[in-house]
Amino acid sequence: MAGLRYSVKVYVLNEDEEWNNLGTGQVSSTYDEQFQGMSLLVRSDSDGSVILRSQIPPDRPYGKYQETLIVWYEAENQGLVLKFQDPAGCQDIWKEICQAQGKDPSIQTTVNISDEPEEDFNEMSVISNMVVLPDCELNTLDQIADIVTSVFSSPVTDRERLAEILKNEAYIPKLLQLFHTCENLENTEGLHHLYEIIKGILFLNEACLFEIMFSDECIMDVVGCLEYDPALDQPKRHRDFLTNDAKFKEVIPITNSELRQKIHQTYRLQYIYDILLPVPSIFEDNFLSTLTTFIFSNKAEIVSMLQKDHKFLYEVFAQLKDETTHDDRRCELLFFFKELCSFSQALQPQSKDALFETLIQLGVLPALKIVMIRDDLQVRSAAAVICAYLVEYSPSRIREFIISEAHVCKDSDLFINVIIKQMICDTDPELGGAVHLMVVLHTLLDPRNMLTTPEKSERSEFLHFFYKHCMHKFTAPLLAATSEHNCEEDDIAGYDKSKNCPNDNQTAQLLALILELLTFCIQHHTFYIRSYILNKDLLRKALILMNSKHTHLILCVLRFMRRMICLNDEAYNNYIIKGNLFEPVVNALLDNGTRYNMLNSAILELFEYIRVENIKPLVSHIVEKFYNTLESIEYVQTFKGLKIKYEKERDRQSQIQKNLHSVLQNIVVFRGTIEEIGLEEEICFMEDAGEVVMPPLEDDDEFMETKRTQEGEAVMPPLEDDDKFTETKRTHQEGEAVMPPLEDDDEFMETKRNQEHEGKVDSPKRTSSGDFKFSSSYSACAAIGTGSPSGSSVVRLVDHPDDEEEKEEDEEEKEEDKEDETSPKKKPHLSS
């Protein structure tokens, strides 16, 4: 077989470990006189020059891979590869090499791994992983497809090498030329191979290849290749759609050719990504990341070019705000802005802010207000999308514009009320526009994105504005849907169920949207929404919807009520209890019967929440009003648990009442003691001043009994005729200053007169008030010879150095004694 020639490509590994193509030629194995042995000789196809002359020494390791590659190293870091066009030629040359080295040609490598250094084997492995593409011809399309599809299971370096070959050898234009050939020949097999090849190249995810494939010269041919999916019976005519159906409209003539070309390219790229390429799995997301980035980059460039052209944008806004602009023209202008806002999502935050700031300054909000009241559904939908973009960008700027209108517009003409009206009047059966506008309202009403500064509180200002000017319009559909069912306050569920409930599907969806936003308001607008709900009796009216045939609407009502209960607000709890607003909920549970569904679970969860959180007013209300009705529900322990909570609280309150009654009794007794102590302190104070004023002597037994109970005070017991003096003396010795009974017998009076003269003790004088007044040099206890002057209960001594005054007092005392002898007998009670 010596002398046979086979077509090959010769590659050499450079210092950077990259493969360089030395050229294409014919290889043969011949005897070389210079080397005195067999060698491989490759001559160029173009000029017959020698591309490669390589000796085949007996100890050099060779390897055969992929049926078309023979690889070896001639020196360190100098790898060589012969890439055969025909596997048969590769096998023939491989036999020549094995024969020259005395090896078995059935093996895939001439090196014995156990005998060679590990680094030599690793070098062979590097060469064996080399990717080499055959010539781009019809009969090699299957090989090319195999290489491109198999490279994804190889290391990343192989994919990079393949991308480098495709770029450097202008392989993609050659493939697209073959596409035209196959299409002309109706070569279906070749077209299927081209589909796999082009799809594989796209999944290489290389920006340098995208630049080639998506150029004006190549992009439509790429689309053509992707039409021939082997999984389809007939190819899809995507090129016809892009060429004939997808018309590019310039709302304002674009003079920048680069901008126009970029717009065309981006549209087609998006079409390829969305329509032609299969949706990647979660493991293949990164395969198209560069393509996504490529599209985003294009969009950012388009937006930047338009943003710089102020004349272009000004003209667009002028026509959009012009009342005389035709509806079709206005629709085109609005769609342009919709695409512009969509493209803006590809911008960096700083660039996006600059764009929307430009749009707001040019008057996009007044323009939207004009188009949102048009009859065209497409126009209103596009306006809703644009509005959502603007609110997402800067809700504060939109709120500022809305509040500024209050001074120049009627309530019905306010921008936010226009939004509410369009949401309510959305004619789309699926309420697509209403959903967009609900998102807008939700963002505007979210206090978490409201600014608060020392000078201004956006939250209070905007919410006050909204609840004053807008809330009644927002809730109008809810109030209208329930107005025919207004019932007595104590019987919300007493209306005729045969009356029209909002059973229309579209109306039910709208009411559900309204209730969802009201639920959000309960959570975030505590004061404002509470006042509105209580004033409008909103929960009662919402609960009328519990009779709707739409379960999703009933669940919205339950969420609305549950959010209210979650706050555990006293005003809400009282409102629910006084209005008996649990009745429609209980009725709905009973009407649902034994069906285990979302409605059943939602209602049970509501009661379970009340039980777990132990909201005491609601627990008591539910048990007292509904336990007899709910007692039969035993498949959950919720209602029994509520009864247990109720009984525990009742017992606790009963115990508290008992304890409180006992405390109140103690307080009454304590107050009496305090009053007595106060009286004692008053007497002591007057004693300190030099005189003791005794209160009037009372005959009332109760009064005297109270006085006797006071300890540590000077007590004058009642005058008795019996022998109680001894007992009085004993009491005095125990620490109390007690006056003995004043006796009428002669012996007692004689003794008393002697004591008065001996001790110079002045007898008490009656004051004008009827009290006794002591002003002696000894205490009352000393006057009867008992007690100690230093005792705590002894009346303090008051000195009277003037003897003349004492004599006068003695004389007065004698006169009083005479009067006592002649006057009727009376037993005075002395007590401090």
Curated annotation (Swiss-Prot):
Query: What is the source species?
Result: Homo sapiens (Human)
Task: Tell me the InterPro entries matching this sequence.
Answer: ARM-type_fold (IPR016024), EVH1_PP4R3 (IPR055236), P4R3-like_central_dom (IPR006887), PH-like_dom_sf (IPR011993), PP4R3-like (IPR051137)
Query: What is any Pfam family matched here?
Result: PP4R3
Gene3D superfamilies found in the cross-reference section: Pleckstrin-homology domain (PH domain)/Phosphotyrosine-binding domain (PTB) (2.30.29.30)
Q: Where is the composition biased (Basic and acidic residues)?
A: 725-735, 749-765
Any one annotated GO CC term: protein phosphatase 4 complex
State the name under which the record lists this protein: Protein PPP4R3C
GO terms for molecular function, please? protein phosphatase activator activity
> Which gene name belongs to this protein?
PPP4R3C
Offer one example of a GO biological process linked to this entry: DNA damage response
Organism superkingdom: Eukaryota
Which residues lie in Acidic residues bias regions? Answer: 801-820
